[in-house]
Each structure stands twice: as structure tokens, then as C-alpha cells.
Regions:
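Acidic, metal/ion-coordinating pockets
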Residues: 2-8, 29, 55, 60, ...
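Short stretches within intrinsically disordered, low-complexity N-terminal or propeptide regions
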Residues: 17-22, 32, 43, 49
Length: 425
């Protein structure tokens, strides 16, 4: 995985318009099972390079009785499409109660003072089973040993990072309304932790140069670009010396970053937005308008979001998939609002076409649930379809079923199920 790495196979721009030659996770003109409308979106990136023949003219001809030349043979070889699966999750929002959970678990596992791995362990098969898995780090990370701070101005334990890596996350988006809760130093420190753990990141930047470079990852030979931006920073001014450190939602800038990803060989470009209104299941007019503009870009294939802390619908806009809100992946919000403990993992499978582009072959939502913390039993994030009928979780079955029902109702409220979106596991 790398930034701005070059790739021989690119999208060309005939007659001034970009044509996808290999699309990213952004859902450009890909078809979902059961949906005859195509929307491009792919998450595998080809890093193979072609070679130019240096043979003199005529040297490729064959004499009578020799086998047909290799070029003709290659041209007749059957096309074998490649596929790639990408999993995305919503907010990683570490309220103080979750630190207690990690302390309780660390006492059992012996892994330091805090161990967040048990918190996420139920998601590990789903996350690690994807070709590419992307999380969203909502808040800045504190120095090792603290001090730590919870809502409303966060500085959270860095022990979450090795837990995310262990769970199977390859990359995290970092642009959010809390990005500069601890100033530029906190922002840069957070990225340092991700770098040290080998987790790629998109969104916030520690240098001006990095702020201009989209993340382009090589996933089994397919290049996937990722662009991240946020609606704002809770009224905290951007650092005067580093105003570029947090990318705000700006249509023209996002489109330019997506185009740069394409120029650097991205087969698929995905845009992750921190947007919407908290605790609102319905996308706002602004979300709908932004989605309408971004999905018209030939360089953007799939758009998804977070921030509302509740699940929002999936929809197809201009032939491309938009996931308005994934809900919380992990949080402990002290509110009576129904649905803050609900989330969903979005899993998209892309399939290569003969022209080298990728289409969405399958789009799934997997409901997740955050269990309550009672001061004794540690919190867990559960894969709902996997656990709802498991005897181990019999006492939680009513809550699991309620989460399953709520998430399914919201995700399909704009008709995504009629276009082939299904519940996965």
C-alpha cells in the first residue's frame, strides 16, 4: 500500500472526459446482484505492468509449420475476471467507559494496561476476511499513558490501534469533527501511531505535501484510491500554520483529489465523508446534494459516510452507490436515542470487466450491535446475523433481533433492497 504510486493501466480521458479503466471502491456504474443497473466500483488494484516489444519489424512472423505466435494465443485466451471484497465500518468513538472495558480485558489477557482486542473480536472473521478493510478513527490519540479525555474534547488511549490492526483493518479514514480536539500535535501523533502499526490512513495530514496526495493502495494487484473529508471541526479553528491538515468537504477539492488518484493508477476511487446530522436516520438535503454532485464525477466510484451515530440508508445516485451513514462501530454514548448502539459493516464485492474496469457485483450490509456496559461485563461489538441464533448469546437475542430489524429497515428505506442489496453475515 502506498501513496500516489504509478500504475501503467490507467483511466484515459478521451474527448475531455475520464473513462474508468479500473474502478475503485466508490461504486461507479456497478451492478449489484439482482440489479440490472451498473455502477462502477472496485477495490482491487492491478499493479502489473505491460511490456513493449523491442523486436524488429517482421520478427514476430512465423514460418510455415511453426506454432501460432504468442500474441495471437494470448488474444484467444479466455478472460478470467478478478474480484475484490471491501469492508467498511463507521465511527470508532472511544468514550471513557470503553477504557474501563479495555482495562478489565487486559487483566484477563495480560496485554498491557488496556486491551481492546476482545471488544472487537467478534468482528474479526468479517473484517480479516475482506481483501481490504477500512475503519474510521473519529478522535485523536493521546500520548502513551495519557492523560486521556472523553467527550466533548477527546484524547483517547492509543491501545486501540494495535487492536484495529489485529482485527484486520488495513486503513482508516481520519477526517472528522474531532480531528483537532488536541490541536495539530494530537492530529500528527495519531497519524504516527497508524504509521507505526502499518495501518494506512486517508484524510488528515501531518505535512502540506501529504495533504495533496490521495491514498492509493495496492490490494492484490488492484489499486484502490481513498479520499476523506469532514463537514467541520466543531467550531475549533484550523491550525493557522497548518490549515491544510484537515480536509473540509469541498466538491471541487474532492474531485481534484479523486482525479489525482486516477492519475496515479487507481482502478477504483472511494470517497468517505463525515457528514449529516447526529441521530438522524434520514440523509439531509446537503448530503443528498453532495452525493448527487460527487457521483457525477468520472473519477469517483463509491461514496460512503459516517458521523450521525445512527445508521442511514444505502441508495444509488447517478448509477453509483452511496452509503449515507454506517452508524457507530464502537461507542458508548449516554443518550436515550434509539439506534446509537446499532451499526453496520458495508461489504462490497467488485468484479472486473473485459475492458479492465470493475463493477459492483454484490453489496451487503451486516448489522452490528454494541453491548451495554454494566460496570462488570465488558462491552463487545457483535456481528448480529452471526450471533442472533447462537445459544451463547441467547440472553441478548431480543436486542440482537431488534437491532437487525432497525438496521435493515433504515438501510433499505430508499429501496436499496429492490436494487439487489442484501443482508450479509
Amino acid at each position: 500500500m502506498y501513496r500516489l504510486s504509478s500504475c501503467l493501466r490507467r483511466r484515459s480521458r478521451p474527448a475531455g472526459a475520464w473513462v474508468a479503466v479500473g474502478v475503485l471502491m466508490a461504486g461507479c456504474s456497478a451492478s449489484v446482484s439482482g440489479d440490472t443497473t451498473e455502477s462502477d466500483a472496485s477495490s482491487s488494484i492491478s499493479a502489473t505492468s505491460s511490456q513493449t516489444s523491442t523486436m524488429p519489424p517482421g520478427s514476430g512472423t512465423t514460418s510455415p509449420g511453426t506454432p501460432s505466435d504468442t500474441t495471437a494465443t494470448a488474444a484467444q485466451a479466455p478472460f478470467v475476471p478478478r474480484t475484490i471484497t471491501v469492508v467498511m465500518n463507521g465511527d470508532v468513538l472511544l468514550h471513557g467507559g470503553l477504557w474501563t472495558t479495555a482495562e478489565i480485558d487486559a487483566a484477563d489477557t495480560g496485554r498491557g494496561d488496556m486491551d481492546f482486542r476482545p471488544l472487537l473480536s467478534d468482528l474479526k472473521p468479517l473484517v480479516s476476511g475482506a481483501d481490504l478493510a477500512v475503519c474510521h478513527m473519529e478522535t485523536p490519540l493521546a500520548p502513551r499513558g495519557g492523560p486521556y479525555a472523553s467527550y466533548p474534547v477527546f484524547s483517547v488511549p492509543p491501545a486501540i490501534v494495535p487492536a484495529l490492526k489485529w482485527t484486520g483493518y488495513d486503513a482508516c479514514t481520519t477526517a472528522s469533527n474531532h480531528s483537532i480536539d488536541q490541536g495539530f500535535d494530537g492530529l500528527a501523533r495519531t497519524l504516527d501511531y497508524f504509521d507505526a502499526a502499518g495501518i494506512e490512513h486517508a484524510g488528515t495530514a501531518a505535512t502540506r505535501q501529504a495533504s495533496r496526495e490521495p491514498l492509493v493502495m495496492d490490494v492484490n494487484g488492484i489499486k484502490v484510491g481513498l479520499v476523506s473529508a469532514t463537514y467541520g471541526t466543531n467550531g475549533i479553528p484550523l491550525p493557522s500554520a497548518q490549515p491544510w491538515s484537515v480536509p473540509l468537504i469541498n466538491i471541487a477539492k474532492i474531485e481534484r483529489m479523486a482525479a489525482r488518484a486516477t492519475d496515479e493508477g487507481a482502478d477504483i476511487v472511494m470517497v468517505a465523508l463525515h457528514w449529516g446530522l447526529e441521530y438522524m436516520h434520514e440523509p439531509t438535503d446537503d448530503q443528498v446534494a453532495i452525493a448527487n454532485q460527487l457521483t457525477r464525477s468520472p473519477d469517483i466510484d463509491f461514496v460512503y459516510g459516517h458521523h450521525a451515530h445512527v445508521v442511514q440508508p444505502y441508495d444509488k445516485v447517478n448509477g453509483k452507490w452511496v452509503v449515507y451513514g454506517l452508524g457507530n462501530m464502537v461507542a458508548q454514548q449516554l443518550t436515550s436515542v434509539e439506534g446509537v448502539d446499532d451499526g453496520n459493516s458495508c461489504r462490497v464485492t467488485f468484479r472486473e470487466r473485459p475492458d479492465g474496469s470493475f463493477r459492483v457485483q454484490k453489496l451487503e450490509y451486516i448489522p452490528t450491535m454494541i453491548t451495554p456496559f454494566d460496570g462488570v461485563h465488558p462491552t463487545r461489538v457483535l456481528n448480529v446475523p452471526q450471533d442472533v441464533d447462537d445459544p451463547e448469546f441467547a440472553q441478548l437475542r431480543p436486542q440482537l433481533q431488534a437491532t437487525d430489524d432497525r438496521v435493515g429497515t433504515v438501510v433499505t428505506s430508499l429501496g436499496a433492497d429492490k436494487r439487489g442489496v442484501t443482508e450479509g453475515q
